[in-house]
């Protein structure tokens, strides 16, 4: 989604040319890739693992299924899906950022996750897969970084099989004022300092906090998924809406 013009969009709180955003986001993730897993644990106090576990459970992957872990980064979801779909299944870990893919591939191979996992560098707005290909698509903490979210959702809907399910796990909008104030304090005062201390990169974590605030709220994203052709769309708030899991189906 743009900020109201056809050739501009947001990068955090900044307005930039739409065709520049992907490179700017790439710079952020090239910078943070090596410390990404450590920072996730520290930033969320480990709660991100519970959010991802719930996403995996909600996905309902079974042996033999084809799963796309889009913006899959360092492979947390891919590792779990690989075990669930088994030897007859397939998991594709796709990410636009080659630094994140390299970290994810090395991590999963160290864990012994091989055989039914492949790695693809791909732009979510134009997925390089056939129509009606995947039983399940997940995108965890990635949609907010996409320039044209509507195009990405349409692309995901296209490559889902009829009966397939899309799950979007993303930071969202806290539901209560006290939580909103605490979350703002944490995001804008504490998080960048963590980024500087652990990853020597305060700027990238300032962007991440800003990108969360610019992401569509729960009901807006639900409407965007419906507009992309997904049906029976709903969402589940977690941690008072700090994170929401949206799900939709293709029939």
Curated annotation (Swiss-Prot):
SUPFAM superfamilies: S-adenosyl-L-methionine-dependent methyltransferases. S-adenosyl-L-methionine binds at residues 74, 95, 123-124. It comes from the Bacteria. InterPro entries: SAM-dependent_MTases_sf, UbiE/COQ5_MeTrFase, UbiE/COQ5_MeTrFase_CS. Its EC number is 2.1.1.163, 2.1.1.201. Gene3D superfamilies: Vaccinia Virus protein VP39. GO terms for molecular function: 2-methoxy-6-polyprenyl-1,4-benzoquinol methyltransferase activity; demethylmenaquinone methyltransferase activity. It catalyses: a 2-demethylmenaquinol + S-adenosyl-L-methionine = a menaquinol + S-adenosyl-L-homocysteine + H(+); a 2-methoxy-6-(all-trans-polyprenyl)benzene-1,4-diol + S-adenosyl-L-methionine = a 5-methoxy-2-methyl-3-(all-trans-polyprenyl)benzene-1,4-diol + S-adenosyl-L-homocysteine + H(+). The keyword Membrane does not apply. Pathway: Quinol/quinone metabolism; menaquinone biosynthesis; menaquinol from 1,4-dihydroxy-2-naphthoate: step 2/2; Cofactor biosynthesis; ubiquinone biosynthesis. Keywords: Menaquinone biosynthesis, Methyltransferase, S-adenosyl-L-methionine, Transferase, Ubiquinone biosynthesis. One of its GO terms (biological process) is menaquinone biosynthetic process. Methyltransferase required for the conversion of demethylmenaquinol (DMKH2) to menaquinol (MKH2) and the conversion of 2-polyprenyl-6-methoxy-1,4-benzoquinol (DDMQH2) to 2-polyprenyl-3-methyl-6-methoxy-1,4-benzoquinol (DMQH2). NCBIfam families: MenG_MenH_UbiE (TIGR01934), PRK00216.1-1 (NF001240), PRK00216.1-5 (NF001244). Belongs to the class I-like SAM-binding methyltransferase superfamily. MenG/UbiE family. This is Ubiquinone/menaquinone biosynthesis C-methyltransferase UbiE. It comes from Shewanella amazonensis (strain ATCC BAA-1098 / SB2B).
């Amino acid at each position: 989604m743009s900020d109201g013009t056809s050739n501009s969009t947001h990068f955090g709180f900044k307005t930039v040319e739409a065709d520049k955003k992907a490179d700017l986001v790439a710079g952020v993730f090239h910078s943070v890739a090596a410390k990404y897993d450590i920072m996730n644990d520290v930033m969320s106090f480990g709660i991100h693992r519970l959010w991802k576990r719930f996403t995996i459970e909600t996905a309902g992957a079974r042996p033999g299924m084809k799963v796309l872990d889009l913006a899959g980064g360092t492979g947390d979801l891919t590792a779990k899906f690989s075990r669930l779909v088994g030897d007859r299944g397939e998991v594709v870990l796709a990410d636009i950022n080659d630094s994140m893919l390299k970290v994810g591939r090395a991590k999963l191979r160290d864990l012994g996750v091989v055989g039914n996992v492949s790695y693809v560098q791909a732009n979510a707005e134009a997925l390089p897969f056939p129509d009606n290909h995947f039983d399940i698509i997940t995108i965890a903490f990635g949609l907010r970084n996409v320039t044209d979210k509507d195009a990405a959702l349409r692309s995901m809907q296209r490559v889902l099989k009829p009966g397939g399910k899309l799950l979007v796990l993303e930071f969202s909008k806290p539901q209560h004022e006290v939580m909103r104030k605490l979350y703002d304090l944490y995001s804008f005062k504490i998080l960048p300092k963590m980024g500087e201390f652990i990853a020597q990169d305060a700027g990238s974590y300032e962007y991440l906090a800003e990108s969360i605030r610019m992401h569509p709220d729960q009901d807006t994203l639900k409407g965007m998924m419906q507009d992309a052709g997904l049906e029976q769309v709903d969402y589940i708030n977690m941690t008072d809406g700090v994170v929401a899991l949206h799900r939709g189906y293709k029939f």
